[in-house]
Amino acid sequence: MAFSSGLWGPCVHMSRAFSQRCFSTTGSLGAIQKMTRVRVVDNSALGNTPYHRPPRCIHVYNKNGVGKVGDRILLAIKGQKKKALIVGHRMPGPTMTPRFDSNNVVLIEDNGNPVGTRIKTPIPTSLRQREGEFSKVLAIAQNFV
């Protein structure tokens, strides 16, 4: 280690051996697009059993390929392909919409019914305005933000 004084006071320079040992992992993306890691927030068996790889989005069912709250996506989860509904994302949205700490999804079947029987995290109230599409998902939600 070597010491030097800089503009903001003394600095410590680490040897080269320490800097080569550093590693980095990718953070979760703010918007949901292809290869984004997501978090399953319902109590379905498929979403809650531990697995060595996190679920990832492999397709977004809209025109621009960027998923927002209320969009449907296709997930790769435990070697299977499953549809999911986005119920929260990290990217800031319009005014008065909540920003979540993680990209949250609820697993759904092909006909739109949720796979689980309970949602563990709060979901945004903006989904209530589109009630016809998501009435069964809203019925199993416990908290709204």
Curated annotation (Swiss-Prot):
This is Large ribosomal subunit protein uL14m. The keyword Ribonucleoprotein applies. Residues 1-30 form a transit peptide. It comes from Bos taurus. The gene is MRPL14. SUPFAM superfamilies: Ribosomal protein L14. It comes from the Eukaryota. One of its GO terms (biological process) is translation. Component of the mitochondrial ribosome large subunit (39S) which comprises a 16S rRNA and about 50 distinct proteins. Interacts with MALSU1. It is found in: Mitochondrion. CDD domains: Ribosomal_uL14. Pfam families: Ribosomal_L14 (PF00238).
